[in-house]
């Protein structure tokens, strides 16, 4: 499993429906990049100027909305994940 460093977060993207309301199946090239995901792992937090570690606001299991083109895509054990900074997360859902 991935263990992110610092203020980084590992997210598993949640894909939207692959079919339109009218029943048309969308090919991969027509799908938008997902912007929702579930937090899989979080880093230990960022280090402030005074050396103090500041914990992250998100935690494992949180469902989040993140910036469309944020992060780096990685593949581990045939699963795709996104590693991004906490500042790229826009909101926690629920």
Swiss-Prot record:
PROSITE patterns on file: CHAPERONINS_CPN10
Gene3D superfamilies from the UniProt entry: GroES chaperonin
One GO term describing the cellular component: cytoplasm
Alphabetical UniProt keywords: Chaperone, Cytoplasm
UniProt xrefs under Pfam families: Cpn10 (PF00166)
Subunit structure: Heptamer of 7 subunits arranged in a ring. Interacts with the chaperonin GroEL.
Record-stated family: Belongs to the GroES chaperonin family.
Annotated function: Together with the chaperonin GroEL, plays an essential role in assisting protein folding. The GroEL-GroES system forms a nano-cage that allows encapsulation of the non-native substrate proteins and provides a physical environment optimized to promote and accelerate protein folding. GroES binds to the apical surface of the GroEL ring, thereby capping the opening of the GroEL channel.
Protein name: Co-chaperonin GroES
Gene source species: Brevibacillus choshinensis
